[in-house]
Amino acid sequence: MKKPSQLLAKSYDRKKYQQPPDYALYTQHNRDVAYSCKALAQVVGAVALANAGLDENLIAEFNRTLLANGWIQDLGKANSHFQAMVSGQSEIIQLLRHETISGLLVCLEPRFQEWLAPLGEKVKLIAVWGAIGHHRKFDDNTFPKKVMELKVYTSDDDFKANLKEMAQDLDLAEPPIFESDLTIAPNKDDICDFLAGESLDKIKAEFRKLESVFADEQSRRFVALVKALGIAADGAASGVAKKYKLAENYSLADFVTENLSKGLKPSDLTTLIYSWAWKSRDLKKEEIDLSKLPPGFVFRTFQENVKASESYLTFAQAGCGSGKSIAAYLWAHKWCDKLEKQGRNNLHIFFCLPTTGTTTEHFKDYALESGIPPELISLTHSRSSVDLETMAETAIQEEANEEENDIAKTASAALKAQQDKIEGLALWSTPLIVTTADTVLGLMANARRAIYSTPAIMQSVIVFDEIHAFDDYLFGHLLVFLKNFPRLPVLLMTASLPEQRRLAIEKVRPDLCYVPGDEKLETLPRYHIQYPVNHQNTWDAVEKCIANNGKVLWVRNRVEWANETYTEAKAKFPDISVNVYHSRLRYKDRSDRHRQVIDDFKQKGKAAILVATQVAEMSLDLSADLLITDIAPPPALIQRMGRLNRRATPDNPGEPKPALICSLPAENQVSPYSKEELKTAKTWVEKLKALNQPLNQKDLADKFAEVSDVKEYDYKEAEKRACFFGIPKNSGLWRTRPGSTREQGYTISVILKADYEAWKKQGLSGEPDADWIRKHEVAVPIRQEALKWEQVAGIRIAPNEAIAYNYNEQTREGVGARWL
């Protein structure tokens, strides 16, 4: 293509603008990224180093490295292939990505090497590693494409001006002046300055040699923080510049400082805690006084002990219904007060739970009605409406996999990337964040949204609740996160944890402060366990409970079993409330069902039956009079039993309630669990039965410890998977690719074709926004054919002939989605 009159960094709407707006210009974007890096270093740098346990004297080196990274990131956009791509040829295949070209220039071009030498080899190297990885697409498997040669426009006035400004900002000598452009070619016979493949092999070989310099964890933490904040800076620069269009209308320094200066005050958390305390009283609104606790209200000893912990890592293990959530906010209040006295007024709280269902209900129960201004709180898995609205983009292929040739899929990948960036940046100015654990621990896998959230994460205290529910990948990421951020305040909570995992946490963090539940509550007799029981026994127990206006919770291991039991219960008891609750409901329907179930169980003197799956283990704050459950692994059964007789207290103990544990319909129908897990469960149940007495939470935990696997957790394997920090010769450092946050699941989220068609009839342009997607997505079991369905906003659309959806919008009854 013909060399453009002005070099571009971003594409723009040529119908709207006769000339490129500032945000699209090569010189302006590079300047914006550098300024954003400088501001992030100023605001977040010191606390990030402290969180990682790094020497505070490294701050000057850190700031300089991050700034150099910002200037280097997009140097390589001054090339013919990239300029063609952002000038309308969006389907062009590039010989090398622009960030790879940036790395080649800095590492191999002699004039660049001499000019940048005063930075120091270490600063330059880390800055380059951050730059070539800022799109998470560089590692051992990065190779040139088999296409024509490209020109690097080193003689262009914009390129020269950019180098001159870079020199001034980094306090370097006058930059080299290139009288002609450089050529990068694919073939050995080509006349060129650099052979693409050979040059790429050369820098990768050099990087491999230098990995040994970063063998210690502290060095790898330094590198990872530079890379993450560099990516976040690029996101901020793209978002702010796109919104304000002209450089005179915005300041990256102001944006970063203002957004990251918003934080919670101790008084905000006092309001949240008092609000929750008053909600426990049956009072009229005018009787509530949020300036104080209700008369006679006293926090439990366990809650006070969690608050009193002085360690950076606290582990609260207490039975279901012990008040762990409020203990967490008391703990956060203590840290908020402590950090405010140290001059930090921008504290964030991340309250992390395992699933979207648990986050939604926690958000409703604690944050939404807390009295804290709504602009200071966020439910991240459903939030998408933020001030930036859109990001300045290059072209859709920039975010797609290198091997992806499908235009629709590349467009969808670009939209998903934009959504992740916007949602990540939104958290900078949102101090109270209720979210899934992936939002934070995704950082360990280089997950895009987590990386863009890094500045907020570094300014936070973090609660990880229900950690027993983390799969092996997520728990491994938790361990790596805890080990590498030893001075970031973290609270872990659960009712039970396998001994293997507890020991693994203690090994990576010997400073762990363990807080057990209140002894009186933990030893309060709550359950009568029965195992095994037959079909008739269960229905007899249900009839007896219903006759006394009791509440029945029946938990099945599979959705189809739950639907069968629900149908049978509805037929047997047509005059009482019978509901089914599982993940096959659209998110908006599931949220309605959740609230309906909670309300039904709160009504005194009125019978109710809830049939549920594993969703009952964490997201339901209800108290049943009868529990019926399929045999399941001990942690799952402990959680299910936590919903039985939940309101019992030492002052008002009541009688222990029956828990009926049923054998599986067939011995081979163990899924979603393993035979080994269920064998352990049977041993655990027999040990409990052998006590020959009403059971308490401590009994459940003690006997679980006796049957837990004490084999040491494989931390080295977790470290390999946590590619954010990485280990030499495997991942991290100069390699930057996204990994997996969780193990592969059994379900996939889809949008129903009927819902998508209804959205299109509204005549809206583009694709549905994230809020609409979240409300309408539904999980279905994975089948190979689903992977071939068309997509919208990164979510597959389920054809009407493949998935049936049973739900009545008026009565709000139905069993949800199923394969046809």
What are these regions (language model features)?
Residues 2, 8-9, 624, 638-641, ...:
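C-terminal accessory region of SF2 helicases/translocases
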Residues 2-272:
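Accessory nucleic-acid engagement/destabilization modules that flank
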Residues 93-97, 583-587, 591, 606-655, ...:
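Conserved RecA-like helicase motor core of SF1/SF2 enzymes
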Residues 310-332:
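Walker A/P-loop
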Residues 346-370, 379-385, 497-501:
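Conserved Walker A/P-loop ATP-binding site and its immediately adjacent core
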Residues 348-362, 545-570, 580:
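Conserved strand-helix element at the start of the C-terminal RecA-like helicase core
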Residues 451-464, 468-519:
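Post-DEXD/H (motif II) to motif III coupling segment of the RecA-like Helicase ATP-binding lobe
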Residues 498-548:
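Interdomain hinge/linker at the junction between the two RecA-like core domains of SF2 helicases
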